[in-house]
Amino acid sequence: MTLYIFAQIIGIAALCCAVCSFQQNNHKKILFFQILSGTLFTVHFTMIGAVFGGVLNFFGMIRSIVFYNKDKKWAQGAKWLYIFSAVFITTGIYFWEGYISLFPMVSMIISTVCFWVTNPKKVRLLMLPASPLWMVYNLINKSIGGFLTETFVLCSVIIGMIRFDRKA
């Protein structure tokens, strides 16, 4: 098995975690699966040579850990929204690959706001614009797992909205 195929398998495992996250109706469970997904995508993107995507996912995993612990004093406060937004912007500048870098960078900022919100309905709504931005980056970097993840995340978010968010 080649390194590329192994990296894509890791990406598919990350896909499973990401899809599961949006089928949860509990904020901590959503974040738990996001931590797993971020960890796997960090490895996946690094292995396929998309280092910027790997670094963004690493910081996304750290963000999910902080937000998971939002009930603890050290993780409270809106400062984290600004800290992580600044981290994603700084990472985008440092790893600048041209305008394509804006897509995942903006997506990570949107998802930072998204995961700060504790209402699962709002989380799903805010995730809608984030996935298409990552799709572009995934296509350019030939991340099969990443592209499929964003496709399934969009579908999963919509299914979650139908299951939990629509009025009877």
Where are these regions (language model features)?
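Alpha-helical membrane-protein topology signature
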Residues: M1-A168
